[in-house]
């Protein structure tokens, strides 16, 4: 069983798509016990590979979702900033009219509230943008950690199997 496990671990370590078993093991594969050990390792290889791929795919989909949010926030920010420029321009014109008595003070106050609301919305969008960027960074880190954990686990198992194989020889 150790040779079959060693073949799986070597394939995992090298990132191969299938296991290349030791020639001695292939030669003895007519033996039902050895054949079963090889099949077990192939199944384990496929399961572990599929699980890793699934985890990384899930993380990538989350990253894409956050990137979509970033694009949406960018568009909303552009619209809000444009709106704020127009309101400020209108407010600037209105202030002169209010001073001269041609427009109501209430209209000026309403416009100032609109400026405050737009500024607040821009601040919220900027905060959301920062959170989405941070989330993308964390997700990328999680993907790297998942791959490193997998490699570390394979290397640890490789070292154990190598010791056991040497002990048997």
What are these regions (language model features)?
Residues 1-14:
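Hydrophobic or amphipathic alpha-helical targeting/insertion segments
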Residues 31, 35-169:
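Long, charged amphipathic alpha-helices with heptad-repeat/coiled-coil character
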Residues 13-39:
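Amphipathic alpha-helical blocks and their helix-capping loop/short-beta junctions
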């Amino acid at each position: 069983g150790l040779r079959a496990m060693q073949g799986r671990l070597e394939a995992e370590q090298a990132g191969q798509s299938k296991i290349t078993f030791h020639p001695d093991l292939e030669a003895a594969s007519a033996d039902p016990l050895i054949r079963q050990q090889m099949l077990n390792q192939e199944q384990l290889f496929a399961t572990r590979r599929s699980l890793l791929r699934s985890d990384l795919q899930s993380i990538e989909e989350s990253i894409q979702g956050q990137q979509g949010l970033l694009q949406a926030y960018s568009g909303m920010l552009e619209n809000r900033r444009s709106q704020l420029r127009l309101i400020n321009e209108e407010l600037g014109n209105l202030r002169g009219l209010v001073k001269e008595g041609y427009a109501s003070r209430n209209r000026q106050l309403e416009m100032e509230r609109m400026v405050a609301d737009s500024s607040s919305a821009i601040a919220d969008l900027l905060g959301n943008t920062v959170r989405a960027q941070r989330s993308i960074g964390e997700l990328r880190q999680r993907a790297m950690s998942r791959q490193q954990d997998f490699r570390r686990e394979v290397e640890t198992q490789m070292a154990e199997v190598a010791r056991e194989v040497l002990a048997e020889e």
